[in-house]
Amino acid sequence: MPTIKQLIRNTRQPIKNVTKSPALRGCPQRRGTCTRVYTITPKKPNSALRKVARVRLTSGFEITAYIPGIGHNLQEHSVVLVRGGRVKDLPGVRYHIVRGTLDAVGVKDRQQGRSKYGVKKPK
């Protein structure tokens, strides 16, 4: 507990909340261009080849974004929309690519959870 003298000398600092997605600069999504599309392996105990893309955003940041869903059409110079949201077993991946917008097409033959993968309602 500080004394009154200590509080006069320097006031209490407000707690600053740190953003989990700084590259978005407070926006819900950002547009970017893929500079590299590749796969990485998750940390223990999981095992897979997770599809990720290195994306240069309009905010100037270069980030690593996860490509959700089965199969994708992304390659270098593809324009994508990026949202926040980390992938728990991929260290350093703090963003997701939004499927069904710009150059990222929706997941083929998706029946359930379609809105998360940019798929229209089947006729």
UniProtKB/Swiss-Prot annotation:
BP GO terms, sorted:
translation
One matching Pfam family is Ribosom_S12_S23
Q: Which InterPro entries does UniProt cross-reference here? A: NA-bd_OB-fold (IPR012340), Ribosomal_uS12 (IPR006032), Ribosomal_uS12_bac (IPR005679)
Its Gene Ontology cellular component terms are: chloroplast; small ribosomal subunit
Where is the chain membrane-spanning?
none
Recorded coiled-coil stretches: none
Q: Which GO terms describe its molecular function?
A: rRNA binding; structural constituent of ribosome
Cell location: Plastid, Chloroplast
Keywords, in A-Z order: Chloroplast, Plastid, Ribonucleoprotein, Ribosomal protein, RNA-binding, rRNA-binding
Q: Which family does it belong to?
A: Belongs to the universal ribosomal protein uS12 family.
| Role, per record | With S4 and S5 plays an important role in translational accuracy. Located at the interface of the 30S and 50S subunits.
Q: How does it assemble?
A: Part of the 30S ribosomal subunit.
- Name of the protein this chain belongs to: Small ribosomal subunit protein uS12cz/uS12cy
Gene transcribed to yield this protein? rps12-A
